[in-house]
């Protein structure tokens, strides 16, 4: 039997609008800028129901942990601006306006490929938004690319 392994480096993230019909306006830019993604955990709690003298357990809805998304920061196209625009949909610090979930939530797909480029695994995380924006370190010592970190709240 031939075994084909999933490699940790063969993946992409796709960000879609909540209706799922079209990629978000910044989707391709952020996909191409991706450096790494933290582990995605699928959790399912139990619901305990008292029934007569006994207890019955049922599975709950699947939930996901928040995931750390690391991106390479490019000046053109502007990765930081695209992330800030998405974050401003959650809360705009200039107008002090809190956004509506339909405005800032996105469907995020984590897609893994095999060595031939065939899709082997897709994790869909509906209702995802940016929890914060770490703008990356700065120093005068080298020519390293700035790494931007974004926790995705799923």
Ranges and model annotations:
Residues 1-154:
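Glycine-rich, low-complexity intrinsically disordered segments
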